[in-house]
C-alpha cells in the first residue's frame, strides 16, 4: 500500500506475513441477546436499522445474524438488539465490531465464556467464509482485543495481537492528533 493507504491483510494461507499498528476508538457497537419467550406470534425479533419479526431462522434478512445463529447452532427463538455509534460500511471496522459483539452476546446467551482469540477467529470466519466479505482479519482482531495493538502475521496465517504500552504523555500527544 502507498502513503495514507489502508488495506486489509489477507488471512489464512494467502498471508505472506506482515504487521500493522491498530487502535480502537471510543465509539461503540452495543449488541444484546436474550431467549425470546414462546408467547409471541414470531419466534425471533432482530432489531437493527429495521425490526424483523420472523418465525424461522431462514427468514432473517440480516445476513450476519442469520449466519451467526447457524454457525453457533442456535435454533431457539432469540431477541437481538443492535445500537451502533457508527453507520454500517463506514470503513473503520463497524461491521467487524458488530460481528465480534454479536458472537460475544450469543455465546454469553448460551452460557459460554469465549476469549478474544476465539471471538476474533469466529468473526473472521463469519465475515470471510460465511458472508464472503472481501476483508482481512485485523479489524476483527482489533475489536476482539481492544486497545492499541501490534498485530503481526506469519507466513501461513498465524497471528499475534500484542498490546502496545505508551506513557501518559505519549497517549495525550497521540489523542490530540487524532
Label each PLM-derived region with a short phrase.
Residues 16-21, 40-44, 76-78, 93, ...:
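Generic structural motif recognizing short loop/turn segments at the entrances and edges of beta-strands
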Residues 13-33:
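Short catalytic helix/loop segments, enriched in acidic residues and glycine
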Residues 14, 24-26, 39-41, 73-75, ...:
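A generic structural signal for short, non-catalytic loop/turn and secondary-structure boundary residues
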Residues 26-126:
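Anion-binding (especially nucleotide phosphate/pyrophosphate-binding) glycine-rich loop
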Residues 1-19, 54, 108-178:
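ATP-dependent small-molecule kinase catalytic core of the GHMP/sugar-kinase superfamily
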Amino acid at each position: 500500500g502507498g502513503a495514507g493507504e489502508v488495506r486489509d491483510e489477507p488471512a489464512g494461507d494467502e498471508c505472506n506475513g506482515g504487521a500493522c499498528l491498530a487502535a480502537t476508538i471510543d465509539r461503540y457497537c452495543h449488541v444484546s441477546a436474550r431467549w425470546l419467550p414462546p408467547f409471541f406470534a414470531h419466534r425471533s425479533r432482530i432489531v437493527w436499522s429495521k425490526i424483523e419479526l420472523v418465525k424461522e431462522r431462514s427468514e432473517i434478512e440480516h445476513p450476519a445474524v442469520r449466519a451467526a445463529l447457524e454457525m453457533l447452532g442456535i435454533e431457539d427463538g432469540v431477541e437481538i438488539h443492535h445500537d451502533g455509534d457508527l453507520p454500517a460500511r463506514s470503513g473503520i471496522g463497524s461491521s467487524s465490531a458488530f460481528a465480534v459483539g454479536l458472537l460475544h452476546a450469543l455465546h454469553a446467551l448460551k452460557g459460554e465464556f469465549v476469549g478474544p482469540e476465539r471471538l476474533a477467529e469466529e468473526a473472521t470466519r463469519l465475515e470471510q467464509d460465511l458472508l464472503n466479505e472481501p476483508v482481512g482479519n485485523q479489524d476483527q482482531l482489533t475489536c476482539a482485543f481492544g486497545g492499541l495493538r501490534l498485530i503481526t502475521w506469519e507466513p501461513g496465517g498465524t497471528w499475534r495481537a500484542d498490546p502496545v504500552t505508551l506513557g501518559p504523555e505519549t497517549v495525550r500527544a497521540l489523542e490530540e492528533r487524532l
